[in-house]
Amino acid sequence: AQDYVELSQEVDHAYCYARIQASRFAARMEIRLAELPEEMQKLKVPRLIIQPLLENALEYGLGDKEENGLLAVSYEEKDGRFYIHLEDNGSVTEEVLEKMRESLQNGANEKGEVTGMINIHRRLQLYYGGMAGLEIKRSVFGGTCVTICLEGEGKDVPFADRG
């Protein structure tokens, strides 16, 4: 399998997963998937950067929602950088958001574990450098917003840790 794919392929894969989950949980949540802008479609990205974050949002962000759950994916281009926003209306606390931000900074959570989110953050930083990676904040919907930050083009780096 390739380590890098076009963003359009990565989005297609993630959206297939999201549609399956949307049909499973249709009674208790809505999943809104924006169309990938044309200028972002050919960007090369590391594989599996979106689907695991969707899975996290469904399991941890919205897992306890009995009804009216919302998960939304949107895109933005600003100053030569590209952003993918994954937002939910889960009931995350400010303390948990802060712990998530700290684990990205430290490269491990408080238990010393490297989570899928940390792995994605590291791979994005390796590939793009600079300001690339994940950002975590409060969503406009009240839950968590995880933003994937991409630079214009990445560099071809070999993967040493395929853990």
Where are these regions (language model features)?
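Two-component histidine phosphotransfer core
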Residues: 1-137, 141-145, 149
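Gram-positive cell-envelope targeting signals
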Residues: 155-163
